[in-house]
Design a protein with these regions (language model features):
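Cyclic nucleotide-binding regulatory module and flanking cytosolic helices
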Residues: 1-33, 37-38, 82-83, 87-90, ...
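Short hydrophobic/aromatic segments of transmembrane alpha-helices and their interfaces
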Residues: 5-7, 98, 108
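A small-molecule sensor/coupling module
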Residues: 22, 94-97, 113-144
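Hydrophobic residues at beta-strand termini and immediately following loops
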Residues: 34-36, 77, 110
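Cyclic nucleotide-binding regulatory domains
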Residues: 40-103
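Short, flexible helix/strand-to-coil boundary loops that buttress conserved ligand/catalytic motifs
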Residues: 64-66, 87, 111, 119-122
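A short hydrophobic beta-strand segment most commonly corresponding to one strand
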Residues: 104-114
Length: 144
């Protein structure tokens, strides 16, 4: 059985990070663990993305509504999953979808301040972040 430490190291943004570096991060960065029941909202569309939200377990639905409100698209994702890392920076820093737990979900949240002040100092974190944000952006573009 994995410990919480092992589980966190398996998250996509932290994969490849040396355990010593992760221990150093834990000393400086406050992690907010949140447990949600099925049906509870994790993040709302058109609200500021000011933290990274990692799903540790469970499943979520992501519903995106067209700008004219005529239609919406719902997709499902299972943990491990990072909610909209591309929305943390850039010109549009609001969530583009509404995220709702479809099962019980455990998540960990890290503030944007912690990301910019501590996590981006680690090359492996920067590379993982760029790869994940790029992959999600490319995936969204291919759906157009």
């Amino acid at each position: 059985m994995d410990t919480m430490f092992d589980t966190l190291l398996q998250l996509p943004l932290l994969q490849g990070l040396a355990p010593e570096d992760f221990t150093s991060i834990l000393e400086k960065v406050k992690l907010h663990f949140v447990k949600l029941k099925a049906g509870e909202t994790i993040a709302r569309a058109n609200t500021p993305c000011n933290e990274l939200i990692f799903l540790l377990n469970g499943e979520v639905s992501a519903t995106t509504t067209s700008s004219d409100g005529i239609y919406s698209l719902t997709e499902f994702a299972q943990a491990p999953y990072l909610i909209e890392p591309q929305s943390l920076f850039g010109m549009r820093t609001d969530y583009t979808a509404k995220y709702v737990a479809t099962t019980e979900v455990n998540s960990v949240r890290v503030s944007k301040t912690a990301v910019t002040g501590h996590l981006l100092k680690y090359e492996i974190f920067r590379l993982n972040y760029l790869n994940i944000a790029s992959s999600q952006s490319q995936s969204l573009h291919s759906k157009l």
